[in-house]
């Protein structure tokens, strides 16, 4: 069973799923805010945080199965499942494959890699030696934050990402490319619950990450609008890839408003 925190009480339950190279503590501000009113489960995915990694944690679907197993073991009623980045992919997988576990979905700065960028990711498993993983992780995380964000927190999160086992790191990054190319559109079409896309960045065709401005769309948001039957979109501006960390107050307010609309 994957490691997790279990805090608070109240319905609906909120299940938080972190990004690649991260852990459950990225959601500390959300757990602190929501746990007086909601049961909050924040997981460490396989190979991240306190959860031991296996070879099959190189596949996105394995992480979805792990979270499903945890939710079933806790006998949770249908929950609001909230993911960031890789966690968005896991969240989509859970909602599409095991719909009875999901009351709603919140995608925090998700993305779908373009065919060219997916190809780059898909080649990582073959082209990136595990001994180069730490440099790869540092280069990735250097682009994930807004310019004014706390440099000590940036350093802390970057160093944490380098602690993922190198072979798992390069293999999982490669599998994100496969998942986006082969699975995402079909899975999105299978979601039948309300979805909030809480978006702060977009990836340009050259693979660079940029902050969004109000009312700006992106290929990923366009895809969600095409495939998801019940979609709301909220933009957090001047922010990097982790709005729950950089802008927790705004993130909490957007989640709170979405929950209120569900009720």
Name each model feature, range by range.
Residues 92-97, 101-133:
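Flexible "cap/lid" loop of the alpha/beta hydrolase fold
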Residues 236-248, 252:
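Catalytic histidine-centered segment of alpha/beta-hydrolase-like enzymes
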């Amino acid at each position: 069973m994957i490691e997790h925190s279990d805090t608070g009480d109240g319905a609906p339950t909120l299940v938080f799923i972190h990004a690649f190279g991260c852990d459950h503590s990225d959601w500390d501000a959300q757990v602190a805010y929501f746990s007086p009113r909601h049961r909050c489960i924040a997981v460490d995915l396989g190979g991240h945080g306190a959860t031991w990694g296996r070879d099959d944690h190189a596949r996105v679907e394995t992480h979805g199965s792990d979270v499903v197993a945890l939710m079933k073991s806790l006998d949770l009623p249908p929950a609001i499942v909230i993911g960031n980045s890789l966690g968005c992919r896991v969240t989509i997988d859970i909602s599409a494959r095991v719909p009875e576990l999901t009351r709603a979905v919140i995608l925090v700065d998700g993305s779908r890699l373009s065919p060219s960028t997916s190809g780059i990711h898909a080649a990582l498993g073959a082209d990136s030696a595990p001994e180069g993983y730490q440099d790869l992780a540092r280069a990735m995380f250097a682009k994930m934050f807004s310019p004014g964000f706390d440099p000590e927190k940036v350093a802390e999160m970057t160093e944490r990402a380098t602690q993922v086992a190198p072979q798992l790191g390069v293999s999982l990054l490669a599998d994100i490319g496969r998942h986006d190319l082969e699975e995402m559109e079909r899975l999105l079409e299978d979601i039948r619950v309300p979805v909030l896309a809480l978006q702060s960045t977009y990836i340009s065709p050259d693979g660079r990450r940029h902050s969004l401005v109000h009312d700006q769309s992106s290929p990923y948001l366009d895809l969600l609008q095409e495939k998801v039957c019940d979609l709301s979109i909220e933009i957090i501006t001047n922010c990097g890839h982790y709005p729950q960390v950089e802008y927790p107050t705004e993130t909490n307010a957007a989640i709170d408003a979405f929950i209120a609309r569900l009720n």
